[in-house]
């Protein structure tokens, strides 16, 4: 509390700091730009933007290190006891996301029987 010689005491409002993890990729940059640049109401919070690749964010989420974070949807099965999914903010779509790379072409039916290597540990 402070008194600026006005004859009354004014309580200083301190913003609550929250860590917000997301990737530096263009889709996340677009989603968080307004918040990062102070162009939208922050709701009285002070967000510390943590920019890291999605695997690192998955690992940090598994340890509960960040208040809010982007994760891969697969990782949610491992961290659902620590975090809740928000109703918006997903970055998914047809033709977007992981690609299957092979030396030769395969049909969808053939792909179902193949062993596929996936990056990351989750």
Could you say what each language-model-derived stretch is?
Residues 31-44:
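Ligand-binding cleft/hinge of the Venus flytrap
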Residues 48-59:
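Short helix-initiation/N-cap motifs at beta->coil->alpha
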Residues 89-122:
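A conserved helix-loop-strand patch within extracytoplasmic ligand-binding domains
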Residues 16, 78-88:
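Ligand-binding "clamshell"
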Residues 53-55, 64-77:
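Beta->alpha turn/N-cap motifs
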Residues 14-26, 47-50, 113-118:
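Short, well-ordered beta-strand elements
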């Amino acid at each position: 509390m402070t008194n600026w010689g006005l004859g009354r005491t004014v309580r200083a409002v301190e913003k609550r700091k929250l860590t917000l993890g997301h990737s530096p990729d263009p889709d996340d940059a677009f989603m968080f730009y307004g918040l990062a640049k102070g162009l939208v109401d922050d709701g009285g919070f002070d967000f510390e933007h943590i920019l890291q690749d999605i695997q690192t964010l998955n690992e940090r989420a598994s340890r509960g290190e960040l208040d809010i974070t982007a994760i891969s949807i697969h990782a949610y099965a491992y961290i659902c006891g620590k975090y809740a999914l928000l109703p918006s903010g997903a970055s998914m779509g047809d033709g977007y996301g992981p690609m299957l790379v092979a030396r030769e072409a395969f049909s969808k039916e053939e792909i179902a029987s193949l062993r596929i290597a996936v990056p990351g540990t989750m």
